[in-house]
Regions:
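N-terminal "domain-start" segment that seeds a small globular fold
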Residues: 18-42
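N-terminal secretory signal peptides that target proteins for export/translocation
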Residues: 1-2
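Short pre-active-site segment immediately N-terminal to redox-active cysteine/selenocysteine motifs
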Residues: 48-50, 54-58, 124
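Conserved redox-active cysteine motifs that mediate thiol-disulfide chemistry
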Residues: 54-71
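Conserved segment of the thioredoxin-like fold in thiol-based oxidoreductases
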Residues: 26-28, 64, 71-114, 119, ...
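Thiol/disulfide oxidoreductase modules built on the thioredoxin-like
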Residues: 97-105, 112-157
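Bacterial N-terminal signal peptides
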Residues: 5-16
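Hydrophobic beta-strand anchors of alpha/beta hydrolase catalytic cores
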Residues: 51-52, 83, 128
């Protein structure tokens, strides 16, 4: 009984830590087409804190998270915060249609061949990577549950102060 309880406690601790982890190393560079048809490059944003959010319209947590990402963008964009939402679906038309109903003002990029999501080793939807001003990856989040946006805000504020 004690062994089973110990395994359960360890499992809960590991699971609670799995959704957010610190990272080190340079963020892989990429250039993708935005919904406006522009080419957007991560390298062009060096000097800003950048959130790269991988999402899909079929992902319910991704859709739940989107308004919170918009609020974060509105609050911190003028302070040097950028947000790139990378849609990973084969056909971007579904994402375009969904975005008509859920407007966001940050850049939405399309990765229909999943090349960028593979560079970032995306294993869950949504996955969110925070990149510091110097271009290094600092945090990664796998999945989304209500309340995660508070952790995003804490991490974005810390990176903006660096």
């Amino acid at each position: 009984m004690l062994r089973a309880f110990s395994v359960l406690v360890v499992g809960i601790l590991v699971a609670s830590l799995a959704w957010a982890a610190q990272l080190t190393g340079p963020a892989p560079g990429f250039t993708l087409t935005s919904r406006d048809g522009d080419q957007v490059s991560l390298a062009e944003l060096k000097g800003n804190v950048v959130m790269v959010n991988f999402w899909a319209t079929w992902c319910v947590p991704c859709r739940q998270e989107m308004p919170h990402l918009q609020a974060l963008y509105e609050r911190y964009n003028s302070l040097g915060f950028e947000l790139l939402a990378v849609n990973v679906e084969d056909d971007p038309e579904g994402a375009r249609a969904w975005l008509e109903e859920t407007p966001v003002t940050f850049p939405v990029l399309f990765d229909p061949k999943n090349e960028v999501s593979q560079l970032y080793k995306v294993v869950a939807m949504p996955s969110t990577v925070l990149v510091a001003r110097d271009g290094t990856m600092r945090f990664i989040h796998h999945g989304y549950k209500p309340g995660y946006e508070n952790e995003y805000q804490t991490q974005v504020r810390a990176l903006l102060r660096e």
